[in-house]
From Swiss-Prot:
This is Protein Jade-3. A zinc finger (C2HC pre-PHD-type) spans 254-288. SMART domains: PHD (SM00249). Component of the HBO1 complex. Scaffold subunit of some HBO1 complexes, which have a histone H4 acetyltransferase activity. InterPro entries: Enhancer_polycomb-like_N (IPR019542), EPHD (IPR034732), Histone_Mod_Regulator (IPR050701), JADE3_PHD (IPR039550), Zinc_finger_PHD-type_CS (IPR019786), Znf_FYVE_PHD (IPR011011), Znf_PHD (IPR001965), Znf_PHD-finger (IPR019787). The keyword Ligase does not apply. It comes from Xenopus tropicalis. GO terms for molecular function: zinc ion binding. Residues 801-810 have a biased composition (Basic residues). Belongs to the JADE family.
Length: 817
């Protein structure tokens, strides 16, 4: 027999690998999975007890020094266990053989120096280099004006006896003219040729705004953008021989400063290399710093700038772009950009502290003017205007004027001979095209006909970078969306699995219940529960229990006395039958009544009246004739006799239960009233036949009583209705006497205090019994018969007049007993 073991936390893992615990490892040693070839035992097993022993429950108190805590997430594949050898003899033995080393063959290789390609075609056929093809294509396209002029030019050349010019030749000539003009103009600007401007000694550094220089800290000019910086201010460790270019000019970029709205100047990049900022802006903004002071790059801690500084608006340029600084005067909050302050000649001081710390002081336009006024008052009055050196603004305007003149004389920068030599065209043809190019450009306000190639490349590179970042963000969002979809799919899958397991469980329960019902039907036994309650679950009912006043002591004291004072005319026959029967018949009739009351009370829980039909079917299986026990209504004759007073006193409870069941559901059909009226005329012969049938079915009732556990008292309590409810739905047929009203008032008060009133929803909660529980079964039977008589008064007035005297005698005899 297989040894039982406790389940560990790792046993619940869903894996298909063979596993075993420490206790079953040696017991089932060799029971691993076998190979398909030789059927041998596996040489290894997976032990999960090591994983279980390693785990510590959360509720266990262990010294932190005695265990290690995993910081990473526990993986499900770890639950499969540890692979350990179980059958060492089944471990395959390796086999090998020594192979002699094969001698290497020397193959002939052709030297590369003897391989030459005489053609310019690519080595791979069908391969086309897109970049080379783009370079070979002409960038200029002729428009309608060019085509019209070309036609007129060809007519002139034909008259002169020269070869005509085709469209491609004219496009290439115009492209070469534009390219040479652009290159020569840039060279003139960079080398100051044609500008005729010589820088004087008052030029200042673009970073520190100081015109002084010293040994080892010379001022260096960029040969392209013409900015002037100190070596220490820009981080130039060694001045190169020849030309020098700043960082932006080396890369051929014209970036925008992230700290101010200005472009150009001494700029350095951030760590990413995609954002640029002025060195002066990085020095004057307190949150920003420079990583390497020797090289003055890269610019860091831009993210440390608070949002309040980004939200400041410059008082000089009125722009909210970038980050502004504020006036150093404590009472002044004027904001301005660093570069705007330099342009407006605001006072910007750099103070060296005693601890070799550099402090930056900046003043707004108002406070700078005050300081300038104080300084001008302290200056000597004999200062003359002998110093005629131009200011910085004058130099800037002079430079702009020279550049404008250079743009107007653009045609002087191109030589026709060089263009003709480069293209291999006759001078006359190139001269015609040169004249047309000059006139067309003059008519367009000296603007170039082609965009410079460098600008096109910059324009292509920047959108490409932007598109790359956009695609990266798009893919990131797409991945997040896919992750959300995956989680949703997992949750939906898990929900459907739970629903499937729940449905399978209900199906199994239904099949088992059907199997039990079939077994009971096949064995001829009565059903242990209602079929509709077994197979179909009713919705839950909500019952409101109301607190009623406690019963008075006087009512409880006289409740046993007045129980038998009143009885209906139908009870006379019942009393006579009771005295005429033996004790055995009375006991069997009581069992029969309890059996039926149990069915009726169970059926009331579902708000249905199908229990009577099921009781009828059980009596059909006993083998009696239908003609002797059934009417056209389908009810047993014994039930009709009990309802209308033809049975014993113990059967009188069935009458009350049937009426309470019908009224609790709020339905009392006309068929039931007709059957009750017709059954009241039962002959004495039928009564004797019913008594014999009840005596013969005692064994059947005893077998049925084993299937029910509810007592007679519980069934009675579930079927009792309040007297006030019954009294409200009926009208008395006659005026009672004073004595009868006095006796009938007491049970109504007692029942009202014991049973709370509620709506007729087919459900009645258990009632709290008063002192009447100590009464005998006989008095209870009479009380139920009395209530039934009040609830169902006799409709036959003739019969009521005949047996009125007998009713009084029966009432007095009940009181005496």
């Amino acid at each position: 027999m297989k040894r039982l073991r406790n389940l560990s936390s790792s046993d619940s893992s869903d894996n298909e690998s063979p596993s075993t615990s420490f206790s079953s490892c040696f017991q089932h040693k060799g029971k691993g999975k076998c190979t398909a070839d030789d059927g041998k035992k596996s040489a290894e097993v997976f032990r999960k007890d090591l994983i279980s022993a390693m785990k510590i429950p959360d509720s266990q108190h262990v010294n932190p020094e005695e265990y290690y805590q995993f910081a990473d997430t526990w993986k499900q594949e770890w639950e499969k266990g540890v692979q350990v050898p179980s059958n060492p003899e089944n471990i395959p033995q390796p086999s090998l053989r020594v192979i002699a080393e094969k001698a290497k063959e020397v193959l002939f290789t052709r030297p590369r120096k003897y391989i030459h390609c005489s053609s310019q075609e690519p080595a791979e056929p069908g391969y086309i280099n897109i970049l080379e093809l783009a370079e070979s294509m002409c960038r200029y396209d002729l428009d309608d004006l060019d085509l019209y002029w070309l036609g007129e030019c060809n007519l002139e050349l034909a008259d002169m006896g020269c070869a005509p010019v085709d469209e491609s030749t004219m496009e290439k000539t115009l492209e070469v003219l534009e390219r040479q003009c652009h290159e020569n103009m840039n060279h003139a600007i960079e080398t100051e040729e044609g500008l005729g401007i010589e820088y004087d000694e008052d030029v200042i550094c673009d970073v520190c705004r100081s015109p002084d220089s010293e040994e080892g800290n010379d001022m260096v000019f960029c040969d392209r953008c013409n900015i002037c910086v100190h070596q220490a201010c820009y981080g130039i460790l060694k001045v190169p021989e020849g030309s020098w270019l700043c960082r932006t000019c080396v890369l051929g970029l014209h970036p925008q400063c992230i700290l101010c709205p200005k472009t150009g100047g001494a700029m350095k990049a951030t760590r990413t290399g995609t954002k640029w900022a002025h060195v002066s802006c990085a020095l004057w903004i307190p949150e920003v710093s420079i990583a390497c002071p020797e090289r003055m790059e890269p610019i860091t801690k831009v993210s440390h700038i608070p949002p309040s500084r980004w939200a400041l608006v410059c008082s000089l340029c009125k722009l909210k772009t970038g980050a502004c600084i504020q006036c150093s005067v404590k009472s002044c909050i004027t904001a301005f950009h660093v570069t705007c302050a330099f342009e407006h000649s605001l006072e910007m001081k750099t103070i060296l502290d005693e601890g070799d710390e550099v402090k930056f002081k900046s003043y707004c336009l108002k406070h700078s003017k005050n300081k300038h006024g104080l300084i001008s008052e302290q200056e000597e009055p004999h200062k003359t205007h002998s110093d005629n050196r131009p200011t910085e603004s004058e130099r800037t305007s002079l430079r702009a004027q020279k550049l404008k003149e250079l743009e107007e004389d653009f045609y002087t920068l191109v030589k026709v001979e060089d263009v003709a030599a480069e293209l291999g065209l006759p001078m006359l043809t190139v001269d015609f095209i040169y004249s047309f190019w000059k006139l067309k450009r003059k008519s367009n306000f000296n603007k170039p006909l082609l965009t410079p190639k460098e600008d096109e490349q910059n324009g292509l590179v920047q959108p490409k970078e932007d598109s790359i970042h956009t695609r990266m963000r798009m893919f990131m969002h797409l991945r997040q969306d896919l992750e959300r979809v995956r989680n949703l799919c997992y949750m939906v899958n898990r929900r459907e699995k739970l629903k499937l397991s729940h449905s399978k469980m209900h199906e199994e329960i239904f099949n088992l219940q059907v199997q039990l019902v079939n077994q009971e039907v096949a064995a001829g036994q009565p059903l242990s529960n209602a079929l509709e309650n077994t197979l179909f679950y009713p919705p839950p009912r909500i019952t409101l229990k109301l607190k009623m006043p406690k019963p008075r002591t006087r009512d409880c004291r006289i409740s046993s006395v007045k129980a038998g004072t009143m009885s209906s005319p139908d009870n006379q026959n019942s009393s006579a039958t009771y005295h005429g029967m033996g004790g055995e018949v009375h006991r069997q009739s009581s069992e029969h009544t309890k059996l039926y009351s149990t069915y009726a009370s169970e059926q009331r829980n579902n708000g249905l009246l199908g229990g009577i039909t099921r009781f009828h079917k059980e009596f059909q299986g006993t083998g009696c004739k239908p003609s002797s026990r059934f009417r056209s209504s389908g009810k047993p004759m014994s039930l009709q006799a009990v309802i209308h007073g033809q049975s014993s006193n113990g059967s009188g409870k069935v009458q009350h239960e049937h009426v309470s069941l019908a009224r609790a559901n709020g339905v009392l059909s006309s068929g039931d009233r007709t059957q009750r009226d017709s059954s009241s005329q039962t002959s004495p012969g039928q009564n004797s036949e019913i008594i014999c049938h009840i005596a013969g079915q005692s064994t059947f009732r005893k077998a049925n009583m084993e299937h029910f556990s509810r007592s007679f008292k519980e069934a009675t309590n579930n079927l009792v209705r309040t007297t006030e409810d019954l009294r409200s739905s009926e009208k008395p047929q006659r005026r009672q006497s004073v004595k009868e009203r006095l006796w009938s008032k007491q049970p109504a008060d007692t029942q009202t205090s014991g049973t709370p009133y509620q709506d007729n929803d087919g459900y009645c909660p258990d009632l709290e019994l008063s002192d009447s529980e100590a009464e005998s079964d006989e008095n209870k039977d009479h009380m139920l018969l009395r209530r039934n008589s009040r609830e169902s008064p006799n409709r036959d007035s003739c019969r009521n007049s005949r047996i009125r005297g007998k009713r009084k005698m029966t009432s007095h005899s009940s009181v005496q007993r």
